[in-house]
Amino acid sequence: LETMPSGIELVDEFISHEGGVPCSTNIMVIGDPGVGKTSILLDTLSSIEKSGRKCLFISGEMGRKQMFKYTKRFKQFGCVTTLFLSDFLEFNSKDVVEQVLSKGFDCVLIDSIAEIVDSVRDDNRWDRKTAESWLVDTCVKNNKGENVEEKFTSFLLIQQVTKAGDFVGSNKLKHMTDAMLEMRKESDRDGGGTYLEFTKNRKMLY
């Protein structure tokens, strides 16, 4: 299975045997707010883009002003092609996402599933289940290369968890992912470090 190395050795070796993000796969990262999910995945995405791959960051969490502040600390993030949903509030978010993804990308980072689903649900007067099913179907469609450039898109999907640390989402959403990574921050008593572990690992990962 072809992979997209980020050039970040620790990340590449952790994600797959071949090193990097495998093509046509969906990797979900869950964890508490502020633990660093966006920073790590944006760093990975920007490195993949520098290697010559066509990448996209779909931001439902941050607007342009927030991203500008972010790039002051992490300059490499400013080079990533980004779709800010907040730029298109007068349009249907479903149509905006579909139109942009139809161009074809090698790797897409979505931050976050909850924000995209809520936006699409509100714009179309759907229930959450219908909006979530639309997102799953859209990802799978692009996994199969059903876009202008026939690229077999991989998705990095950020999702929040409940206060108890449980995954938020339907079984359909859970089943469409090839791997699920949980990101946690240790208490200061335990060293205060951040760690990643696979809670689901199917198809291409160790």
What spans do the regions from the language model cover?
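Hydrophobic beta-strand residues in large extracellular and virion-surface proteins
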Residues: 11, 27-29, 55-58, 82, ...
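Short beta->alpha connector loops
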Residues: 35, 89-90, 161-164
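Conserved inter-motif catalytic segment of the P-loop NTP-binding fold
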Residues: 32, 51-134, 141, 151
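The Walker A/P-loop phosphate-binding site
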Residues: 1-77
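Helical mechanochemical/support elements of P-loop NTPase systems and associated helical scaffolds
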Residues: 7-10, 40, 63, 92, ...
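Phosphate-binding/switch region of NTP-binding enzymes
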Residues: 137-206
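Acidic, amphipathic alpha-helical patches
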Residues: 17, 96, 170
